[in-house]
Regions:
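Cytosolic nucleotide-utilizing catalytic cores of signal-transduction proteins
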Residues: 1-78
Length: 78
């Protein structure tokens, strides 16, 4: 992700928060719809999961939120 100078983590999170709606997620990210579609393809290849499956999407989003909280806690402790 860092090597490609893109934020695939944030892209996936916004996509999931927008209930897998490409148009709404692209608007939220202020990027072109095709750019989002390309990033989602990269994400699918990296994680090898069906991000459009409702159960998978819920699990991913829950994990991402827990990860974000954990990172915030670590920053506070420093």
């Amino acid at each position: 992700d860092r090597e490609n100078n893109t934020d695939l983590y944030y892209t996936l999170k916004v996509y999931l928060l927008n209930e897998n709606n490409v148009t709404m997620a692209a608007d939220s990210l202020h990027i072109h719809r095709n750019t989002l579609v390309y990033r989602l393809k990269q994400i699918r290849e990296c994680i090898e999961a069906d991000i459009n499956d409702n159960e998978t999407a819920r699990e991913l989003l829950a994990f991402m939120m827990m990860y974000d909280v954990s990172r915030q806690d670590q920053k506070r402790q420093k």
